[in-house]
Structure formats: C-alpha cells, structure tokens
Amino acid sequence: MDLMSFKEKEISKKDCLELFEDTENFFDVIKLADSIRKDIVGDTVTYVVNANINFTNVCSGTCKFCAFKAEHGDPNAFFLNPDEVAKKALEARKIGATEVCIQGGLLKEIDTYFQAEILKKVKKITEPYEEIVVHAFSPMEVKSAAENAGLSVNEALKILKENGLNSMPGTAAEILNDEIRSEICPTKLKTSEWIDVVTNAHKTGIKTTCTMMYGHIEENKHLAEHLSILRKIQKETGGFTEFVPLTFLHENAPLHHMERVKSGASGMLDLKTYAISRIFFKDYIKNIQTSWVKLGTKLSQVSLNCGANDIGGTLMEESISKAAGGSYGTFMSEEKLKDMILAVGRIPKQRNTAYEIIE
C-alpha cells in the first residue's frame, strides 16, 4: 500500500476499506492523517461553549443501542414543555453558552409545530442576551414530526428555519446501510430517507453535522460505505460543518446482549477511525470532532494527533451517553477543555456552531 500517495489524492471507497482492513501500518496511517490535518486546519483545536437539552426521554423508537429511552408512566420518564426548554436555554446563555443542542424523542404529540414552538420560545427568551444558536432535532426527529403534522420534510424544514432553527445534528445516521439498520434500529428512517432529510436541510440553508456510530455489528466494508455516502453528499451540498465519529457505548445498551455484538470498539479502532476519516475527507469536511464524553480525556487528546481538530463542547448536560454507560461525565468547563488542548501542544480557540473563531 502506497500510503504517501494518499496524502494528495482523493482516495476511493476501495482504498478506504483497505485502510480499515490493514493491520500492519497503524502508526503510518496515524502519521499521515496528522500530517493532512496540519496542512488543512493547522495546529488550532476548536471547542464550543454549549449546552445539551434533552426535552424528553419518552420515545416510541426501537433503537437497540439506546439506554436513554423511557416508556410513558416510567418513574424516570420526563417531558419538558416549550417554556421549560426555553428556561434551560436561558440559563445556559447567561453562563456563556453560544449554542444549545435540543433533542427529544419520537412521539405522536411531537410534531413540526411543537418543535417550532420550542424554537420560538428559545429565541424570544434569549434575545435580550444576544441570540443563541439553536442546533436542534435529528433527521429522524424532523421526519417523524413532519409526518405527525401531515407535512412533507421540505415543508417542515422551512417552518423550522422560519422559526429559528440555525443548524441540525446529523445524528440518527448510525451506519448508513439498511441491512445493519434493520438489526440495530429497525423502525428508524432508512439510509435513503436520512440522505433526503440532510440534503434538503442543506438546500433550505440549514447546515448539519454528520456522524457515524461504530464498534457494534458493522464490518469494515460498512464503515467505508458510510464515509463514502457522506463525502458524496458533501460534494453535492457543502452542508456538513463537521464529522463526528461516535464509538458505541455498550454497557447498558440492549444491543449488547445480541450475538455478534462487539463490546464496543478497541482503542486502536477508535484512533484508526479518526485517522481514516481525515485521510478520506481531506478538506471536503475540514472539521473532525473528537468526543471526550465517549472516549474520555486521554484518548481524546491522542485523537488530536490522529486527524481530529475539534474537541466538542462543554455540554453542561448530556444524558444519552451517560445512560448508555458513559463514565466520563456530562460537563467540562471551558478552562478544562483549554487545558486538554494545551497539554498536547496545540492552540485552543473558542468557536461558534459555524466554526467561526470567537475572539
């Protein structure tokens, strides 16, 4: 394998698969990814001061990797109304958050108009403190809410944008292969539907992130296929702001009890995934975010030398990873994030959702 030729050229899906299959050149792959990272984004590592607001844990979904879901009537079930969501957003804004990430569940009572009401309330209550960016509703949530409202996805996206939606999390992607999806999230939107929602969001002027959850039942060919789909979308729309690899947290997830399921990814696969993503995307998707919530502080720091250039956010509240067995906390102060970055010899810079540096 001529790794050095991969530095300049756009590698194919076949090349990508070969990198995942390769067991002999791990450190050379890491070194190449770090070199590409330095060429494209330099030594700056960005972070965002943000808050996660999960407005309900009640959901009709059947995702087998989710340990966060509750049923109606469960003692731990909760459902925040739009005013309660707005109050949480205001609290976050008052202590410096520039972004709130708002997500909920799949329920008949959650339609596009309910989502729009959340957006309006958040925008109104935070207006006196300078506008906060609302990064909200996964592609699955948008599709489900549109159906509940009797709207097309396009109609729903326009309503959400008009009411203050600034950007969307590109979650619900998991692995973009319908055979895998039929096993791990059988009632979630299909690959083509996920693509339809995000491409239409981009065309509506709503940027999104993109993600990939790995370390469960997928094979290397599925990882290469997934990255290839994301790059194709980015070439067409340019609407992805970042790529976030999400390592599967298995401890409390129902999926963990299925045969064939791995006990999460190895540390080697975690780092390899960051590296191969950087080599594959190059500057099509310039920003690759590491997740301290899922990897922990030390492995996140190592990933910054494997192609990643963003360390995510302060979060302030993050319930989903914690429910799945994540043990690295749900909040990290801005000072600690900066210390993490400085400790590996890189330059910390606060950014906004659009990756513009906040001086």
UniProtKB/Swiss-Prot annotation:
The UniProt entry, under CDD domains, shows: Radical_SAM (cd01335)
| SUPFAM superfamilies named in the record | Radical SAM enzymes
Q: Please state what the protein is called.
A: 5-amino-6-(D-ribitylamino)uracil--L-tyrosine 4-hydroxyphenyl transferase
The reply to whether Transmembrane helix figures as a keyword in the UniProt entry is no
Which sites bind [4Fe-4S] cluster? 59, 63, 66
The EC number on file is 2.5.1.147
**Cofactor-binding details, from the entry:** Binds 1 [4Fe-4S] cluster. The cluster is coordinated with 3 cysteines and an exchangeable S-adenosyl-L-methionine.
Q: Which residues form the Radical SAM core domain?
A: 45-282
InterPro entries named among the record's database cross-references: Aldolase_TIM, CofH/MnqC-like_C, CofH_family, Elp3/MiaA/NifB-like_rSAM, F420, FO_synthase_su2, rSAM
Catalysis: reaction(s): 5-amino-6-(D-ribitylamino)uracil + L-tyrosine + S-adenosyl-L-methionine = 5-amino-5-(4-hydroxybenzyl)-6-(D-ribitylimino)-5,6-dihydrouracil + 2-iminoacetate + 5'-deoxyadenosine + L-methionine + H(+)
Give GO MF terms, alphabetically. Answer: 4 iron, 4 sulfur cluster binding; 5-amino-6-(D-ribitylamino)uracil--L-tyrosine 4-hydroxyphenyl transferase activity; 7,8-didemethyl-8-hydroxy-5-deazariboflavin synthase activity; iron ion binding
Instruction: Enumerate the cofactors the protein uses.
Output: [4Fe-4S] cluster
Assigned protein family: Belongs to the radical SAM superfamily. CofH family.
- Keywords noted in UniProt: 4Fe-4S, Iron, Iron-sulfur, Metal-binding, S-adenosyl-L-methionine, Transferase
Q: In which pathway does it act?
A: Cofactor biosynthesis; coenzyme F0 biosynthesis
